[in-house]
Amino acid sequence: MPLTNTQIRYYDSNVLRLPKDKRETYNAQVDRLITALRKKLKDQDKITIKRVVKAGSFAKHTILRKTSDSQVDVDVVFYVSGEKVAEETFASLSEKIYEALLKMYPNKAVEDFEIQRKAATVSFVGTGLDVDIVPVIENPDKEGYGWQFDRIDGSKTETCAPCQIKFVKERKDQDPDFRTLVRLAKRWRTNMECPLKSFHIELIMAHVLEVNGKDGSLEKRFRDFLLYIAESGLKEVITFPENSTIPAFSHPVVILDPVCDTNNVTSRITEDERKEIVRIAEKSWATANFASVEGDYDIWKELFGRSFKVEDAA
């Protein structure tokens, strides 16, 4: 017997989705960090922060709640501008943010701080929160847009955090269950150790919505997500109505960023990883179909993990 929409929504609400009280706690913690860091950077390095945007899965409401082996991750985009920016490299901006965070939290262990390719990260073990501070050089001619730099290879990508949030909201307005399906797919990805990032999943799910529409049960639509990956092999170029031009890419997987035509968000997926993603999706689709026919919750746990449940314990 297939899972009902009510059962899947129960699982999403009680196991996957970040509860309202936790969201409020994290929001308050992030707001305090933003206020302190903004002041620290201005006083310490004369860096002007023109705008701050909470971004990523947290802002899109597709984030999963904290588990025993995963933190809640919040992206905070700092739009940087002013004459001082011209004197800085992106690496130095990340370094200055990292140094400011160290000074702001002198009692935290050094391993709670990290400089990544495009962000400086601070981890709060007590609340289970990771905050990625992402510096973006503001484009004064395009509202919400700016350039995000890679600290390792020096490449830059145009981005628009508010536009990415709007993209998901518009899909949710079109399909009230869009975020539920994204969270289902993210839990599947994590449990199956599939090398897809959260942003990739959001975009693939949006593409499947565009192609198939919102008809059908939630269970079937999740299976259709797996089926799309399995049948396409992720060899099709995925674009969106927001894209105006389609450049040619040579990467194994091409999914265009809906806010930047020149950005292939899957450019770092290797051919071996593409094959692995497709292999996992094929196997998972078969497992999901078998679980649906058998009506066996234990089989669903093979896809979603031991925490999978669709009703209160008796």
Swiss-Prot record:
GO biological process, one term: nucleotide metabolic process
One Pfam family this sequence matches: SMODS
Transmembrane segments annotated in the record for this chain: none
GO CC terms in record: cytosol; membrane
The UniProt record lists the keyword Lipid metabolism: no
One GO molecular-function entry: metal ion binding
Enzyme Commission number, as recorded: 2.7.7.-
Binding site for Mg(2+): 73, 75
Coiled coil: none
Cofactor(s) recorded in Swiss-Prot or TrEMBL: Mg(2+)
Residues given in the record as ATP binding sites: 60, 75, 186, 197-199, 263
Keywords of the record: Antiviral defense, ATP-binding, Magnesium, Metal-binding, Nucleotide metabolism, Nucleotide-binding, Nucleotidyltransferase, Transferase
Keyword set includes Ligase: no
Entry function: Cyclic nucleotide synthase (second messenger synthase) of a CBASS antivirus system. CBASS (cyclic oligonucleotide-based antiphage signaling system) provides immunity against bacteriophage. The CD-NTase protein synthesizes cyclic nucleotides in response to infection; these serve as specific second messenger signals. The signals activate a diverse range of effectors, leading to bacterial cell death and thus abortive phage infection. A type III CBASS system.
Subunit structure, interactors included: Forms complexes with Cap7 with 1:1 and 2:2 stoichimetry, and a 1:1:6 CdnC:Cap7:Cap6 complex.
Record family assignment: Belongs to the CD-NTase family. C01 subfamily.
Record's protein name: CBASS oligonucleotide cyclase CdnC
Gene field: cdnC
